[in-house]
Amino acid sequence: MCGIAGQISADPNKIAANYPAYCRMQKSLARRGPDQRGIYLHGHAALIHARLAVVDLENGCQPMVLDQGGEKYILVYNGELYNTPELHAQLAALGHRFVSHSDTEVLLHAFAQWGPDCLEKLN
């Protein structure tokens, strides 16, 4: 099971100042996800992920970022989508372009396309 941590702060200076703490958090999650680790800092948020790779070992790195239509979407995720191929096909037909075969990327594109309503489409 992957490890996920993070912080949201009203003061963006606290996010930047806490970077050493995020590195320690990430290190403490290493046993949860030995395959890849990542930290994403932006404005008022910090996202930390330690990945236990199951699908797409090379390209499913997290936190995963998607820039689409002038919007930026960032996701840390632990789980498994059982209908990844179907959702991938639907999203590709709508013009989404993928760089991996990970369910994380499919989930990220699904949210970009349908917003919170994407949850109704997940299996």
Where are the model-predicted features located?
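N-terminus-centric sequence/structural signature that marks the extreme N-terminus
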Residues: 1-123
